[in-house]
Regions:
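Conserved donor-binding/catalytic core segment of Leloir-type glycosyltransferases
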Residues: 144-180
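Nucleotide-activated donor-binding/catalytic signature segment of Leloir-type glycosyltransferases, i.e.
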Residues: 187-205
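Aromatic "clamp/platform" in nucleotide-sugar-dependent glycosyltransferases that forms part
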Residues: 222
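Short hydrophobic beta-strand element within catalytic cores of glycosyltransferases
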Residues: 230, 239-242
């Protein structure tokens, strides 16, 4: 995003301070020094702020904005209420109440999809706007598209309970399945599903080439706000097989770029008949980081 920004931009993130990993979600870094984060923001003296986290750094930024009358937008990217319910049985009303207080005073709550916007509007969130995403060029492979003799299915992302991956892994006798990523249930899945290929983390052009070697991208999660890996897959010509839920319904054009429904295996088999070259050419025109930053500027810099 920053590459396309026309403004002088600073990023405040947990790596600038002492931090710890969230015990049940290690990829989430929690800043242990929010006061230092506040001082860092004050030192920069920004004219506008976008807050992309509801954690300690986000709270520090929000307090700074309120005290200094700085216009700000917020981003809602993760369904933490659903995750915390699945992992810790924390009731939805507790986390959504906190999130409403956190977000509702911003100039705009930027969300990745129209269905996510509708969900938040129904829950009483104000000024919710859709903020699209893009695909970096190094994540689009220039390798030719080839159809496999035995269908190759791929998932890329966090390997955790809320991603519903066992539904995909149970198809290990019917397809060649590859899972790219790591997470707390990786060891368990490796033991339970020996025929599934688990590659761990992969990035950049290597990941792009892995996408290209497969036939269908399967996204079994029912709790994501968007799923940027889906547009990465589409940019490499992979149709999407998923459930008809928030995220996939905003990305997949039924019968053109994938299939959605309750039967994941059937969705995969139908995807195998789609034109991959057509998918790749259409998606590369649709998703743009330049458009993404334009949306941010529109809402953050607009007159109150």
């Amino acid at each position: 995003i920053l590459k396309y920004s026309r403004k002088k931009t600073y990023v405040i993130h947990p790596g600038l301070f002492k931090w710890k990993s969230f015990s049940i979600y290690p990829e989430v870094q929690i800043c242990k020094e929010p006061l230092k984060a506040y001082r860092k923001i004050k030192e920069i003296d920004p004219t506008h702020i976008h807050i992309g986290t509801e954690g300690p750094i986000g709270l520090a930024a929000r307090v700074y904005c309120k005290l200094n009358k700085i216009p700000y937008t917020t981003g809602y990217h993760t369904k933490f209420p659903e995750y915390l319910w699945k992992l810790l049985r924390i009731p939805h009303f507790i986390t959504y109440s906190y999130l409403k207080v956190f977000h509702n005073d911003s100039k705009a709550i930027l969300v990745p999809s129209h269905s996510c916007k509708e969900e938040l509007n129904k829950k009483g969130f104000n000024q919710v706007e859709v903020w699209t995403r893009g695909v970096s060029k190094n994540l689009i492979s220039d390798k030719p598209i080839r159809k496999s003799k035995f269908p190759k299915i791929i998932y890329v992302g966090r390997v955790s309970k809320e991603k519903n991956l066992e539904v995909l892994c149970e198809l290990q006798d019917k397809f060649e399945i590859t899972i790219v990523g790591e997470g707390p249930i990786l060891k368990k899945l490796k033991l339970k599903y020996p025929k599934v290929n688990f590659l761990g983390y992969r990035f950049g052009s290597e990941l792009a080439d892995i996408y290209k070697r497969h036939d269908v991208f399967c996204f079994p999660s029912k709790t994501d706000t968007f799923g940027i890996v889906m547009i990465e897959a589409l940019a490499n010509g992979l149709p999407i097989a998923a459930y008809k839920v928030t995220g996939p319904i905003d990305i997949v054009e039924e019968g053109v770029t994938g299939y959605l429904g309750d039967d994941l295996e059937n969705n995969i088999r139908r995807c195998l008949k789609l034109d991959r070259r057509s998918i790749a050419s259409n998606m590369n025109q649709k998703w743009s980081w330049a458009n993404c930053i334009e949306i941010l500027h529109t809402h953050l810099l607009k007159e109150s």
